[in-house]
Amino acid sequence: MSELFDIEKRKGIITIAAAVIISLALGAGLNQVGSGFAQRSSQGITVTGSAKTSAKADNVVWTLNVSQVSPTAGAGITKVNSGVDAVTKYLVDGGITQAEITLGSLSSFGNEEWQNGNSTGRIISYRVSRDVTVRTKKVDTVFTLSQGIGSVIAAGVPVNNYGPQYLISTLSDLRPQLLAEAMKDAKVRAEAITKAVGGTVGAVTNVRSGVIQVTTPDSTQALDSGAYDTSTIDKTVTATVSVTFKTK
């Protein structure tokens, strides 16, 4: 009977000790959590503000490549030059001036014959190519020409169309305007958050500017390094700022 009493007594002691340990641990944990909230409160509130605007490309770069494979380099050069002339005529007839067209240098390389995975050292054909690049502010003209380039290809000219790159030259002007609007947006957000908990927004203690994002109008793309879509004439330009405010 005494042995049973001793066992129950030891269980009671262990239970009390465990309760003390748990209470101490919880107390320490709550103290740490409380300290964390206090630190966050003393640092104020950090919010992200954003602003966007619609923009239209005012510059375009369009590169076309005329490429031909022929038995000899000479034959390839002749055909490529003929193709370049046809492409140039198409561009000029469509409203592009000669001054807006740049012809790249001719490039060629020999295609070797291979047998059983080994080169025989014999050249069986030559690939010759030349770039035709348009640089202009006539973005609408280039858009129309790019849609009709198929007529040149249908005529037998071997053209590789890399597609126009539509660019905005006024980004340096848009950036400060957008950042100012993003700052206002950040303050509105901070005031809404602090008002909900009975506080007020104080002075700005830190500002970090984000990268500019240039995207298609319906895009949600956002890259850490910044996005710059060149596939469309119409674009959306977005700026963000991260702002820390004191709170009261």
Where are these regions (language model features)?
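Short, charge-dense linear interaction motifs
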Residues: 2-248
